[in-house]
Amino acid sequence: MSNIYIQEPPTNGKVLLKTTAGDIDIELWSKEAPKACRNFIQLCLEAYYDNTIFHRVVPGFIVQGGDPTGTGTGGESIYGAPFKDEFHSRLRFNRRGLVAMANAGPHDNGSQFFFTLGRADELNNKHTIFGKVTGDTVYNMLRLTEVDIDDEERPRNPHRIKSCEVLFNPFDDITPREIKKPKNEKPEEEVKKLKPKGTKNFSLLSFGEEAEEEEEEVNRVSQSMKGRSKSSHDLLKDDPHLSSVPAVESEKDDATGDLEDDGEDDSAERDEYMEDDEKNLMRERIAKRLKKDASASVKSAGDGEKKPASRSEELRKEARQLKRELLAAKQKKETAIKVEEGREEEEAAPDGAVAEYRREKQKYEALRKQQPKKGTSREDQTLALLSQFKSKLTQAITETPENSVPEAEVEDDEGWMSHVLQFEDKTRKVKDASMQDSDTFEIYDPRNPVNKRRREESKKLLREKKERR
């Protein structure tokens, strides 16, 4: 990332966007893109972007906003007409967090802008880059993408800009205009479509079919009774407490017109009151019916669970029985094979070595058969053998040399206990320097006074010999 910061020019200008996803700091390149920065700053000062939505979200690509109509086709620049593109060699779409002008073609810039969510080389030399998102506010910018999007890249619950604040204005000559922001031309019906209505999925319920039938019946009755008075006889046909005979017979047509008018008003109020009562009563009946169906379905489900459980228990019993039978058959086969092998060994005429091996084998097999089975008795036997072995070791250690067992010539089970380890004595003996020995080493030092004296004497003798000659 360091090479990006080195390549990008320094910024001059800063704006703070307060959105529903959090604050977003934008630093501007007012020297590289003066027209786009002047347009953006003046629109922020004029509160042009207040309460506008981010109408387009493309995950991993861009988040677009700045249209007061919210349709993606509105928005005007401060110049009264679209202004030209401003490209710079040091500004490229090579990372996220860049702010650029949105347009429909070359030199068609208005008020709409977008944030980049990643590298977008295909936008180079097509859109004017005029700012960048700085600091930790880039994470608030990424939160703008955390919305549900339809097939047309429009968010169903879009984030919006609450207000704008210019922190540093590089253009001192900007004077905000008094303009009226265009109203949202989107019809109310289209706005309502953005929030889809929830549908009742009766298939998720165990009693879904009955609930769906009850719902259809309620809808059908409400449609048929719409616009006219309703009676409890129309809905509760199977209630024995209700009588089909009216409690008070209606007056005949010879009543006066004033009385008829008064009766109509009273009947209208009474119909409204009865309509509310009937709705509440119908809801209670449906709730009771659903509870009964739910309890019945739970019972049936419980019975159904018991049956498979009993079936699975039977299968487990059969598996255990089959396993026991297979194990018994295997043991029977092994015993038969052993008996057959014993017969063959007895029938064969073995030599001496084989006969000795068989005797040893029979001996150890007999000992193995004498051992008790696993349990407390086996444990007691093991402890007894261990204590016997300890006593043997103690006896071998405490024996005196007079009573020691002589070393056996032939190895047996107890011969190793009477064996004594003896090691070679490798201690160094002190040698006398005056004694000549085969291991004596001569040490000659020419600096030794004795050696010097010997050399002088030898030289003197050599000179005397030469003189004699």
Swiss-Prot record:
Family membership: Belongs to the cyclophilin-type PPIase family.
Keyword field contains Coiled coil: yes
GO biological-process terms attached to the record: protein folding
UniProt GO MF annotations: peptidyl-prolyl cis-trans isomerase activity
Entry-linked CDD domains: CWC27_CTD (cd22288), cyclophilin_CeCYP16-like (cd01925)
UniProt protein name: Spliceosome-associated protein CWC27 homolog
Modified residues (N-acetylserine): 2
Keywords, comma-separated and alphabetical: Acetylation, Coiled coil, Nucleus
Ranges for domain PPIase cyclophilin-type: 11-166
InterPro entries the record matches: Cyclophilin-like_dom_sf (IPR029000), Cyclophilin-type_PPIase_CS (IPR020892), Cyclophilin-type_PPIase_dom (IPR002130), Cyclophilin_A-like (IPR044666)
Compositional bias segments (type: Basic and acidic residues): 175-193, 231-241, 302-341, 356-368, 454-469
Compositionally biased region (Polar residues): 384-403
